Amino acid sequence: SGNIMPRPSLRLVVFGGFSAGFMLFMGMSLQQAGLVYTTAGKAGFITSLYVVIVPILALFWKQSTNPGTWIGAILAAIGLYFLSVTEKFTVEFGDLLEFFCAFFWAGQVLIIGWLSPRIQSVKLAFTQFVVCAVLSLMVAMVFEDIAWNALVQATWPILYGGILSSGVAFTFQVMAQRNTHPAHASIIMSLEAVFAAIGGWLLLNEILSMRGLMGCGLMLGGMLLSQLWGIKSRTTASISD
């Protein structure tokens, strides 16, 4: 009975779900807008800088973490650079949008990390998606020309992105962050870039260069370091007790 979560107040569900949904909406919107003005590789790298931003912002929430997480986050960021940025790095307008996007992704991870132990996972995820969907529809109706034929032609990509990439993935995030430090979660989720590169190599016959492989290795190393350091710290603490 000690593991039963107390019933959250309606105010917490609404406020928390709106906060997480707004962060999700802003992160997705800025990411898509930035892609119009920059390359996919640079966008992937800059957006994933949330892996470093999360532990920094967590300090303001008084959520300290161990040195292994900081080192792991920096290794992951360096690995992302090698994996994502191949051309000469110059700052464009789209890069600034992606940079602001990274802060909203970091905020979403931190908010979910705070809410997930307090609100049932499915309830929090559902509220987050409803808020994000409503805000996205409102913005689309104002700034986009919505054509039914275009929606029909993009049915499967829309369903995949909405159900699997967003619905399933972000619900798993909410469930996992009940027992995971936000900084650790951000490092693990940054491995999205590694899976994308490997998937492109296996399924689309894309070339994975030595530079890309080195980037993947650094990111995997950063993830393992952050996790193993935490295990070592907990083991040492239990022995001393």
Feature map (PLM): residue ranges:
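C-terminal transmembrane-helix exit sites in multi-pass transporters
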Residues: P6, Y50-I71, V194-L213
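Hydrophobic alpha-helical transmembrane segments of multi-pass membrane transport proteins
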Residues: F15-Y37, L57, F82, F99-I111, ...
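Hydrophobic/aromatic residues within transmembrane alpha-helices
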Residues: G34, T39, F60-T65, L115, ...
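Hydrophobic core positions of alpha-helical segments in small-molecule transporters
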Residues: I46-L49, G68-I71, F93, F100, ...
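Transmembrane alpha-helical segments that form core, pore/gating elements
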Residues: V54-P55, E87-E144, I158, F172, ...
